[in-house]
């Protein structure tokens, strides 16, 4: 059970350690920090680099973490005026007698596991302890380089920029002990329906890491477009991408994986199949059944264009063999997982499949079992742990390898049903953690019956999932105590029918932070109660400001009237929050 925090309140401000640590205590002494602070890593002095073997992943992770810490403190910090009463003189004075951080000691208690750059869930101890003395000594202790990364991340959240110059913390002394509730804390990003430039993908990874989230689920292909280059099958992207400049090269994929590995974020690629695969038609039309049926596409697919890989085709099997033989070895050095998709398989589409000609589950289920068995065997041969969407297990009742991770999305019951069958589960109920909901329909409707039926044109998962709703979601809801170990964590999802690079940041941040805290800290407090919005809101407001300082166009949480009149416990000078009911 996670412990409560002991907050050191100062002025009307708040120390926004996000996500919430296991234990945290602070004081009200001021410490300044400058670029020349001495840093040691297990005794090896250097301000930014040079730790351990030059090419080791441990060295890369620690070096990058230190450089990122300095960049955050001195280039991407915030002046916290929004968190103090209006027109107040809240900034400390910098004088010749001001106390500075004198040293930062990073102590790793043991060697990193061999798979630190592509960890199997739970194999990396992500815990850390942080101590910052009022006399200026800072010590961060962790069993792994990732723990040190997270400790340094929390360290940056203790400091603010002064409008007069300099960087300070008003919180010394500080003591933190911390570790995650769940080992899988992810975001699913769809790059098929709208393309996301590499700069946006890097920014997503950076923001995930800053929130101590550790998985980027890359939904790389879908019905609408195939932007992923496969060198042995060049026409897939040459014909399946929206445009020649909207493709991901093998070098892009590797670079994204490497960037994630240095920040503790494992990139997990998904090729959705057999459904959601219509974009293959543009290069291999003979492999796709029920392609772009009009006008009644909705009889054959969840959204246009309809189409599915044929289910009983040797040509499809050959295609998948070649695809995986090309892709999997390139992914393997930097991930232990591969997502095979499997959601929203439409039985009616197979009435138009010349290798099946049926929508009967009695016919389709054994064919789908055979289809998935082949995919699973190829993943096993390549050394991957498979993921699938819940429909493969719960709707089609497929027999899956025991190490398969089942990604749920339809209900809390889906999580409970998955673990009841003995499988690992990822939570992510669309009624709580779908970030794209609430924008209204993206389909157009003909005048008359169609328009009247769908008026006022809400989308299927409206309303928008406010951060407070996301924060209330418990991944363990309905799961028996003796099966909670099978819930590895979860993901929040940004599908992209109406999300492109212009609004991507707004759609994801800071609401994904709420999911991140649930996954790191747990949905319940030490007393077993739902965590309070009142105490979370000031911290989330500050995290939003820190994301903006990092170049993320995150949506506002509250107006300054609210943030200027609250404290770390959500109250004001008279004990009552100003913006609460």
Q: What is each of the regions a protein language model found here?
A:
Residues 31-33, 37-41, 185-188, 217-219, ...:
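Structural recognition of the beta-strand scaffold that forms the well-ordered cores
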Residues 1-16:
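Fungal secretory targeting signals
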């Amino acid at each position: 059970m996670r412990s409560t925090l002991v907050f050191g309140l100062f002025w009307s401000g708040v120390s926004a350690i996000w996500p919430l640590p296991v234990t945290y205590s602070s004081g009200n002494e001021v410490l300044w920090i400058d670029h020349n602070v001495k840093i040691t890593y297990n005794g090896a002095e250097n301000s930014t680099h040079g730790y351990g073997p030059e090419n080791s992943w441990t060295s890369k992770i620690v070096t990058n973490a230190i450089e990122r810490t300095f960049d955050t403190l001195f280039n991407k910090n915030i002046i916290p005026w929004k968190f103090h009463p209006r027109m107040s003189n809240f900034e400390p004075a910098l004088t010749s007698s001001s106390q500075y951080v004198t040293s930062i000691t990073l102590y790793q208690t043991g060697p990193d596991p061999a798979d630190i750059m592509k960890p199997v869930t739970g194999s990396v101890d992500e815990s850390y302890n942080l101590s910052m003395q009022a006399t200026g000594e800072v010590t961060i202790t962790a069993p792994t380089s990732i723990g040190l990364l997270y400790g340094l991340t929390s360290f940056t959240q203790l400091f603010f920029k002064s409008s007069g110059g300099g960087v300070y913390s008003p919180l010394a002394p500080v003591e933190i002990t911390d570790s995650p509730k769940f080992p899988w804390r992810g975001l699913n990003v769809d790059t098929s329906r709208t393309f996301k430039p590499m700069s946006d993908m890097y920014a997503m990874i950076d923001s995930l890491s800053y929130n101590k989230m550790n998985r980027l689920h890359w939904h790389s292909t879908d019905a609408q477009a195939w932007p992923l280059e496969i060198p042995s099958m060049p026409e897939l992207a040459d014909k399946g991408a929206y445009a020649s400049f909207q493709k991901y090269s093998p070098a892009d994929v590797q670079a994204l994986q490497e960037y994630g590995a240095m920040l503790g974020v494992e990139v997990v690629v998904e090729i959705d199949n057999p459904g959601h695969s219509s974009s293959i038609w543009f290069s291999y039309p003979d492999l796709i059944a029920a392609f772009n049926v009009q006008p009644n596409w909705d009889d054959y697919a969840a959204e246009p264009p309809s189409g599915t890989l044929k289910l009983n085709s040797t040509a499809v099997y050959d295609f998948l063999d070649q695809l995986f033989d090309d892709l999997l070895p390139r992914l393997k050095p930097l991930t232990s997982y591969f997502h095979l998709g499997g959601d929203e398989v439409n039985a009616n589409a197979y009435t138009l499949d010349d290798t099946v000609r049926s929508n009967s589950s009695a016919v389709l289920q054994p064919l789908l079992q055979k289809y998935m068995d082949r995919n699973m065997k190829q993943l096993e041969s390549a050394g991957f742990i498979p993921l699938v969407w819940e429909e493969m297990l719960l709707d089609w009742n497929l027999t899956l390898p025991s190490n398969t991770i089942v990604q749920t999305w339809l209900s809390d019951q889906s999580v409970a049903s998955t673990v009841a069958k003995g499988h690992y589960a990822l939570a992510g109920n669309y009624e709580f953690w779908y970030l794209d909901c609430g924008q209204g329909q993206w389909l157009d409707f003909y005048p008359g019956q169609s328009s009247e039926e769908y008026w006022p044109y809400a989308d299927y998962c409206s309303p928008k999932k406010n951060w407070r709703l996301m924060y209330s979601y418990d991944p363990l809801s309905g799961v028996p105590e003796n099966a909670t170990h099978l819930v590895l964590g979860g993901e929040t999802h940004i599908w992209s029918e109406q999300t492109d690079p212009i609004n991507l940041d707004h759609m994801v941040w800071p609401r994904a932070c709420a999911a991140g805290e649930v996954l790191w800290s747990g949905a319940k407090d030490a007393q077993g109660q739902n965590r309070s919005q009142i105490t979370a809101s000031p911290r989330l407001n500050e995290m939003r400001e820190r994301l903006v300082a990092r170049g993320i166009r995150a949506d506002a949480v509250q107006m300054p009237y609210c943030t200027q009149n609250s404290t770390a416990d959500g109250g004001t000078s008279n004990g009552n929050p100003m913006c609460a009911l």
